[in-house]
């Protein structure tokens, strides 16, 4: 569960950067 949370958090951060 923790690993999944980290993966989701990383994905959200990347998406935020791509969206600007």
Curated annotation (Swiss-Prot):
Keywords associated with the record = ATP-binding, Chaperone, Nucleotide-binding, Stress response
Q: Is Glycosyltransferase among this UniProt entry's keywords?
A: no
Any one GO MF annotation of this record: ATP binding
Entry annotated with the keyword ATP-binding: yes
Q: What induces it?
A: By stress conditions e.g. heat shock.
Per the UniProt entry, the signal peptide is none
What does this gene product do? Acts as a chaperone.
Q: Which family does it belong to?
A: Belongs to the heat shock protein 70 family.
Put simply, this protein is called Chaperone protein DnaK
**Native source species:** Mycobacterium avium
Name the gene for this chain. Answer: dnaK
